[in-house]
């Protein structure tokens, strides 16, 4: 992948985060839908950094698998705990009511993703 694509992918990640932020304020939207966009923001941010570093990007939504491509000493904020978002890009999109999410959990996820976005922005400017 071309290094320039990293910036394009990062813009999409930022938009996913903004979408999640807007969705989080609407009580008629499933929290799982909001967290899907949070997960996408994190996933695309990580993939943008890999692209920038010219490391092959795995074709997966599994944040753990994506994180394994990074040096252990250069993980994004949240590290491997970001993997907790992975189910929102897969099975949790197709289930309703098996696990009740709180507003605080959504807020925490948004904050975690924002830290990843900030980390990515710095990485792409180096």
Name every feature range the model reports, one short phrase each.
Residues 1-126:
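Terminal alpha-helical segments
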